[in-house]
Swiss-Prot record:
Function: Binds 23S rRNA and is also seen to make contacts with the A and possibly P site tRNAs.
Record text on subunit structure and interactions: Part of the 50S ribosomal subunit.
Pfam families from the UniProt entry: Ribosomal_L16
A GO molecular-function annotation: rRNA binding
Protein name, per record: Large ribosomal subunit protein uL16
Keyword list, A-Z: Ribonucleoprotein, Ribosomal protein, RNA-binding, rRNA-binding, tRNA-binding
High-level lineage: Bacteria, Pseudomonadati, Pseudomonadota, Gammaproteobacteria, Moraxellales
CC annotations in GO: cytosolic large ribosomal subunit
UniProt keyword tRNA-binding present: yes
Gene Ontology terms: biological process: translation
PANTHER family from the UniProt entry: 50S/60S RIBOSOMAL PROTEIN L16, LARGE RIBOSOMAL SUBUNIT PROTEIN UL16M
InterPro entries: Ribosomal_uL16, Ribosomal_uL16_bact-type, Ribosomal_uL16_CS, Ribosomal_uL16_dom, Ribosomal_uL16_sf
Record gene name: rplP
């Protein structure tokens, strides 16, 4: 499971996920990519599930680039615990996704196979996505 090796602080404020993704919004490493069209959170488990779906479909054909990393800790209190008494324990890690963010890229496979793999991966994600290709200038 993906998570930071160390962080400056153990717990963070909830915050608000607003705006569009300007960084990480272009296809940089591969030839075809999957891009978020809605905002949301992607847990480390979802990142891994989508990666496995892609790698199972393309087998040993190409290279997968993961462009997201879960760097935000999410805390939860145990069941049947009263309110108050401080913030809960860190349960899992998420990556805040803004519309326009590139999530995964593939290099070295034909476009039809990559589209099939991304369709399988999109089913594992909690927001809408689209498939984009690299534009050559």
């Amino acid at each position: 499971m993906l998570q930071p090796k160390r962080t400056k602080f153990r717990k963070v404020h909830k915050g608000r996920n607003t705006g569009l993704a300007h960084r990480g919004s272009t296809v940089s490493f591969g030839s075809i990519a999957i891009k978020a069209t809605e905002r949301g959170r992607m847990t480390a488990r979802q990142i891994e599930a989508a990666r496995r779906a892609i790698s199972r479909r393309i087998k040993r054909g190409g290279k997968i680039f993961i462009r997201v990393f879960p760097d935000k800790p999410i805390t939860e209190k145990p069941l049947e615990v009263r309110m108050g008494n401080g913030k809960g324990n860190v349960e899992y890690w998420v990556c805040e996704i803004k519309p326009g963010k590139i999530l995964y890229e593939i290099e070295g496979v034909n476009e039809d196979l990559a589209r099939e793999a991304f369709a399988l991966a999109a089913a594992k994600l909690p927001f809408k996505t689209t498939i984009v290709t690299r534009t050559v200038m």
